[in-house]
Amino acid sequence: MIEVDQSAGAPVRKHKFYQILYVQVLVAIVIGVLLGYFKPDLGEAMKPLGDGFIKLVKMIIAPVIFLTVTTGIAAMSDLKKVGRVAGKAMVYFLVFSTLALIIGMVVSHIVQPGAGLHIDPASLDQKSVAGYVTKAHDSTITGFLLNIIPATMLSPFVGGDILQVLFVAVLFGLSLAMVGPRAQPITDFFNALSAPVFKLVAILMKAAPIGAFGAMAFTIGKYGIKSIVNLAMLVGTFYATSVLFVVVVLGMVARYNGFSIIKLVRYIREELLLVLGTSSSEAALPTLMEKMERAGCSKSVVGLVVPTGYSFNLDGTNIYMTMAALFIAQACDIPLSLGDQILLLLVAMLSSKGAAGVTGAGFITLAATLSVVPTVPVAGMALILGVDRFMSECRALTNLVGNATASIVVARWEGELDKTALHVALNSDGELPSTDPTSPARQGH
């Protein structure tokens, strides 16, 4: 396997296959599954390894987003472009999020994964989902919008809220651009600061196999592979639908915009394996942003589209929400009228916005949706509680591919896509190690 550094004059370095990160993560996942299966108690005890890695990644997310967005916007000569990029991104997010919801609903009608279970809602354990429902009730649309505005300029960096960091970064970047040449020393400082920050990302990623091992060992050790058997139809249908969405829907979008979805998936395979191991798409956020810039998307587009997409472009979560809601209705023998399903769709469109890219967020979002739609019992969520963790991986994987696709598409719409860089990246082995944010590959086009 050859690793290519695209910076000028950089030597070509060869790596043995076992030194490549995605191979290490894949091996770690397999070992974690085996440990959790054969030694469940020991597997459960590995949970701190996964949690620790997630905390390490979250530690660096805020500075990565702030520096990428701020320097990207500050470099823009046309400030109207910021609003234009954001507007195009939101249109893309709305269209494909809605399409994902509809596809989940249509497939559920065709396959009927919950039919024949004949569950009495009164017999379900409502206490098991009470915590999720409480969190869902606390999450209103108004509260979500107000929460984007931080208490202070520094509080987002303490709390790690992605949208708050993005909000501050956009405002600060606009301020730098409006001040003009006088702000150039600050912009230069941020560009220089980006180098050690992205080098730190590369250092932290060395711990990815340990995190993936711990998270997977815990998942299998606690929930067991057998817990998935009883609800295999739902889980299998969800996985198949997600693959269908990526290959067919996103595949058509990719082909129309001049690239291959299969090559894109291959290009971000390290990030996908990281997400698979941790069930959190946030774990791959820093390296995904870096890779999308290497693939020819300008820094300004990546800085706006990727972090925003983590709250507004969750294709996997959207498929899951309508599919899970209809599964519960079918299992409880509750017929849904056309009006009920339209209401479910509309509520899901709203409640899915702002769902965080962390484990369990999709379940909380589902609780928020069902608590507004009276026809489907919230207590029915107890039916899928045991296998939600297994569906969480697929949700996160689909979300990640969706956001990578969105970055390229919006960059192309905006004329900010280096097609040569995209071709080189997607036809390489995906191992592009340079983390220097001042290199040509990382600048706006």
UniProtKB/Swiss-Prot annotation:
Main localisation: membrane
GO molecular function: fumarate transmembrane transporter activity; malate:proton symporter activity; succinate transmembrane transporter activity
A single GO cellular-component term on record: plasma membrane
UniProt topology in membrane: Multi-pass membrane protein
Transport among keywords: yes
Function: Responsible for the transport of dicarboxylates such as succinate, fumarate, and malate from the periplasm across the membrane.
Protein name according to UniProt: C4-dicarboxylate transport protein
Organism: Bordetella avium (strain 197N)
